[in-house]
Amino acid sequence: MVSKIRTFGWVQNPGKFENLKRVVQVFDRNSKVHNEVKNIKIPTLVKESKIQKELVAIMNQHDLIYTYKELVGTGTSIRSEAPCDAIIQATIADQGNKKGYIDNWSSDGFLRWAHALGFIEYINKSDSFVITDVGLAYSKSADGSAIEKEILIEAISSYPPAIRILTLLEDGQHLTKFDLGKNLGFSGESGFTSLPEGILLDTLANAMPKDKGEIRNNWEGSSDKYARMIGGWLDKLGLVKQGKKEFIIPTLGKPDNKEFISHAFKITGEGLKVLRRAKGSTKFTRVPKRVYWEMLATNLTDKEYVRTRRALILEILIKAGSLKIEQIQDNLKKLGFDEVIETIENDIKGLINTGIFIEIKGRFYQLKDHILQFVIPNRGVTKQLVKSELEEKKSELRHKLKYVPHEYIELIEIARNSTQDRILEMKVMEFFMKVYGYRGKHLGGSRKPDGAIYTVGSPIDYGVIVDTKAYSGGYNLPIGQADEMQRYVEENQTRNKHINPNEWWKVYPSSVTEFKFLFVSGHFKGNYKAQLTRLNHITNCNGAVLSVEELLIGGEMIKAGTLTLEEVRRKFNNGEINF
């Protein structure tokens, strides 16, 4: 059993094919790069004598099999100050060649890329890598040659996420990384997040000019990053064309804004040819796809369980012709995975969104792809795979939510991850507007609440000042955050631009005269009720807290017609809202 649970198949960082080739060539003892790294780069860049000698000795072996640590190395808390201590680090120069080497995080990205395209193979038992036949052919191909490009296109054709991107672009639309990201991978979990494009564009339209570059370049979910990187590779191979996409955004009390998103893509004629071949819809044989157990979940707490469940679903489909969903459920149960049908449907949707062609006809599912053999690690020898409480909760919600899109179940995980604050606030605001039917705006940023929503056409139209918090251990509403909300409530009451020049309260139309405040998080603990009561006494405004689970359940009831926004208004009683 391996000591680490690696994640492969999804790449966010590297984009230069010339650097990818250098990484592959360190596995080819006859390449110039191998000798350069062994004889020049490592002796020059690796300052620790013991590590330097070990790496050179490893590269002198007859059979070049490198461990993950030998390739990627280690890091420090300050990434820019980490010393060079691994083969890939020494193989690629950093941007601007200031240090002469890259860090371990970037090295991991290049390793994943080489593995994703099938140039190297992972040996699970020893946590190591070896070059493949196609990797050796790529290493030996002349730089910039037709053969090199042919090898790259063949490799990308067997990489499911690349084919997924081409499939989404197939009808000729000009799609942004957000359009692509929301339909890529296993939406509904924190490893595959996508920012709501409409809310991002609205934020751009209302942002200060100095902040727009930061929003365009750095505001994205993990799936958006994957889409951006894959789109960049496809662009370099001539399979898609990248070009900015422009939008006209209405803004309150101002002329319409023209905004753009830089990372947007359209398929080319060459791309359509590659896609037709991948689908087996030409005279050529369908290109086999490489799928790895390690790509079937990324950031989940119980990713071993979920990866294995999804891998087994794929194996069941490989062995069968056409199966009903209930038959897949029965087969899974025999293998020790007792799952509701909605979870299996969600997994199959994720496999499709990963780039695997599965045909759905009514209740029948049929795999249309040729999948190369892949390994499901036997990790249950000492540890039985059991669903976590979180996975049980998600499974329960998939069964309950008939009207709410299941992609929003990801809020359950996102709300527990403090690094995902921005995604949480944007997704929550999108949910309030798309599912509940509130009007409003995502605000965020300095001296603004996360969002402002309001009703139109209710018996009593009301507005809500919204603050969201992603917190791992439950949110106790500390006094600092309560004081911040007090400030927003009072700013909305006085509406004095000398106190806050950004005038965020202009979101609310003059017809809205009753206001509430709301905190949204994963779950609440501690003395939050006392803070809500204190805020109510100071501001004479009623508020509440709302867990993301209750947010989802309330949305389901709204869509089912069993709850109205007026009934939601009456639940603001300075406590926790439960539906």
From Swiss-Prot:
Q: What does the record list as GO biological process?
A: DNA restriction-modification system
- GO molecular function annotation: DNA binding; type II site-specific deoxyribonuclease activity
**Catalyzed reactions:** Endonucleolytic cleavage of DNA to give specific double-stranded fragments with terminal 5'-phosphates
Q: Does the keyword Calcium apply?
A: no
Q: Which residues form the active site?
A: D450, D467, K469
CDD domains in UniProt: FokI_N, FokI_nuclease-like
Q: Which UniProt keywords apply?
A: DNA-binding, Endonuclease, Hydrolase, Magnesium, Nuclease, Restriction system
Read off the InterPro entries from this record.
Answer: FokI_cleavage_dom (IPR015334), FokI_D1 (IPR004234), FokI_D2 (IPR004233), FokI_D3 (IPR031655), FokI_dom_1_2 (IPR044945), Restrct_endonuc-II-like (IPR011335), WH-like_DNA-bd_sf (IPR036388), WH_DNA-bd_sf (IPR036390)
Q: How is it used?
A: Adding the endonuclease domain C-terminal to different DNA recognition domains from other enzymes allows generation of novel restriction enzymes that are used to genetically engineer eukaryotic cells.
EC no.?
A: 3.1.21.4
- Claim: DNA-binding is one of the keywords in the record: yes
Cofactor requirements of the protein: Mg(2+)
What free text does the record give on domains? Has an N-terminal DNA recognition domain (approximately residues 1-292) joined to an endonuclease domain (residues 389-583) by a flexible linker.
Subunit notes for this chain? Monomer, in which form it can cleave DNA. Homodimer when bound to DNA.
Name of the protein in its database record = Type II restriction enzyme FokI
Tell me what organism the protein belongs to.
Planomicrobium okeanokoites
Gene giving rise to this polypeptide: fokIR
